[in-house]
């Protein structure tokens, strides 16, 4: 199984008033080429997809166009995306019903079960080779304050 790990795309970023859009477009084209050339099975995007929790429409189009194109060109590619500190976890997860049809799994929000414990099953993503589970990815998004584990105060 070949896993390609990326992070910190920061789509939509300007750097000292320099718009990095062209740079991002070139990166995404290069990434598609690498996935094709090296026959990648899993693409892991570990946070900071966007530079802002409220990305521009153009940045979102760039992101979704990339996901559509790369999954169309590589039907067996599995993509796992986790939210970083620059991303809006809820915004990243919002299109999950559509993305799941493209074999894209997004984990942005740490969920809790009925007992109030972190739902670890939600964070464990099976990785497949030829339809068989061959590994697991623990897809833990950036821990925001309300998801931190708390220790008992009476010790």
Regions found by a protein language model. Name each.
Residues 49-66, 83-102, 108:
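Metal-dependent catalytic neighborhoods of phosphoester/phosphodiester hydrolases
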Residues 147-153:
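Conserved small/polar residues in nucleotide/adenosyl-binding loops
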Residues 1-4, 123-138, 144:
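Beta-strand-turn-beta hairpins that frame and shape the catalytic cleft
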Residues 80-83, 139-143:
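Divalent metal-dependent hydrolysis catalytic cores, especially in the metallo-beta-lactamase
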Residues 27-37, 119-134:
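Short amphipathic alpha-helices and their capping/turn segments at secondary-structure boundaries
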Residues 78-80, 105, 136:
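Proline-centered loop/turn at the N-terminus of a beta-strand
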């Amino acid at each position: 199984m070949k896993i390609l790990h990326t992070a910190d795309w920061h789509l939509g970023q300007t750097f000292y008033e320099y718009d990095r859009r062209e740079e991002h477009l070139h990166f995404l084209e290069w990434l598609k080429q690498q996935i094709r050339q090296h026959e990648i099975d899993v693409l892991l995007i570990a946070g900071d997809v966007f530079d802002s929790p409220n990305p521009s429409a153009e940045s979102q189009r760039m992101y979704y166009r990339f996901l559509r194109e790369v999954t169309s060109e590589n039907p067996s590619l599995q993509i796992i995306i986790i939210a970083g500190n620059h991303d809006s976890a809820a915004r990243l997860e919002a299109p999950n019903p559509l993305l799941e049809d493209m074999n894209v799994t997004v984990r942005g929000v740490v969920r809790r079960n009925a007992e109030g414990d972190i739902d670890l099953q939600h964070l464990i993503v099976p990785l497949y080779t030829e339809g068989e589970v061959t590994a697991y990815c623990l897809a833990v998004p950036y821990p925001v304050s309300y998801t931190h584990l708390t220790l008992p105060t009476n010790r």
